[in-house]
Regions:
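Basic, alpha-helical nucleic-acid-binding regions used in initiation and control of genome expression
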Residues: 7-10, 27-322
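Cysteine-rich micro-motifs
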Residues: 6-23
Length: 322
């Protein structure tokens, strides 16, 4: 008779049939526990959320309108009437980085436009043992849209959002441009970090982000990609020479970005913009902003700067008015 591990005999199951019965019972117990958790979540949601307040979608600000329209488009088949599937199940990227995608959903949730759907996978929720409050995973929960205050259907609300985007506000569009442009630059920065494997991705610090945003006032997204490419390329070479400690090289990134930009602009040297990525790799927010709101496509990526976005909207408005 073959030797068995001590735990085999201690378990009490000495044949295949017994083990199968035990496994089936364990699976049933898990399902029962899951159903109990779902019931607890539903009860806690009802107590904490109550009824969903209607929203006046006509009165939404331009940024909120853009956020909601982009979220619905990115959800694609995951949007059905007043339900939006979990972020992690969406086929494309809403924002260029996960941070931007989550910012959009947090903003919409904070404004009462969307709320967690009780029909979500119960494993997306957790209940506090202290006060019974409900917490949830932003990326794994399903969402429900608040009803329209005038009773519009969700397809009518979507048409309303679409029409609203065609009447852009220069200040709001400038805010969106900086937000999306910085996110696209962060994505490109992290991609270059993967190329130079000895540069850690977490070197994109708050200082680097602030520097990039400052430079974007004078540069297009494509031009900023050019700067990022050469800054990281030179610092990667410097890191390999081992002249400086690696952390010191990382700390040089914000200053080097500023110096590269100042040197090019100060000496009237052109900064050739990198080309816009293909639609297959671009985020939905970037595509909607560049193609629909700004209406300039590739040239908006390669030429528009933070300072020129607002005036370009005003020029379009005057041209359309004529």
């Amino acid at each position: 008779m073959p030797l068995r591990a001590p735990g085999f005999w201690a378990s009490g199951y000495r044949c295949t049939t017994c083990r199968e019965v035990a496994d089936a019972q364990a699976e049933r117990n898990q399902l029962i526990a899951l159903e109990r958790h779902r019931a607890s979540v539903l009860q806690a949601l009802v107590q904490s959320c109550g009824t969903v307040e209607p929203v006046d979608y006509v009165a939404l600000g331009y940024v909120e309108t853009f956020f909601l329209y982009s979220a619905l488009v990115a959800a694609n088949a995951g949007w059905d009437d007043d339900r939006i599937s979990p972020i992690d199940s969406h086929p494309g990227q809403l924002g260029a980085t996960p941070d931007l995608t989550e910012h959009v959903y947090k903003t919409l949730h904070g404004a009462g436009i969307i709320s967690p759907a009780p029909s979500s996978d119960p494993r997306a929720f957790s209940i506090s043992d202290v006060d019974g409050s409900v917490d949830f995973s932003l990326r794994k929960v399903s969402w429900r849209l608040a009803p329209d205050v005038t009773g519009r259907s969700m397809s009518e609300v979507f048409a309303l959002l679409l029409a609203r985007l065609d009447d852009p506000e220069p200040e709001a569009v400038t805010q969106l441009w900086f937000m999306i442009a910085e996110s696209e630059c962060r994505k490109y920065f992290l991609k270059q970090c993967e190329r130079y494997t000895y540069i850690k991705s977490d070197v994109y610090t708050v200082k680097v982000m602030d520097t990039v945003r400052s430079c974007l006032a004078h540069l297009s997204i494509g031009q900023m990609w050019n700067i990022i490419f050469y800054v990281l390329k030179d610092l990667a070479a410097l890191s390999q020479e081992k002249t400086y400690a690696r952390q010191h090289v990382y700390n040089m990134i914000p200053g080097n970005i500023r110096r590269y930009v100042d040197h090019r602009i100060g000496n009237d040297r052109p900064i050739h913009p990198w080309r816009r990525p293909s639609p297959a790799t671009e985020s939905w927010m970037s595509s909607i902003l560049l193609d629909k709101v700004l209406g300039e496509g590739d040239s908006a990526f390669e030429e528009l700067t933070g300072q020129s976005v607002g005036p370009s909207i005003g020029f379009r408005w005057r041209a359309d008015g004529d």
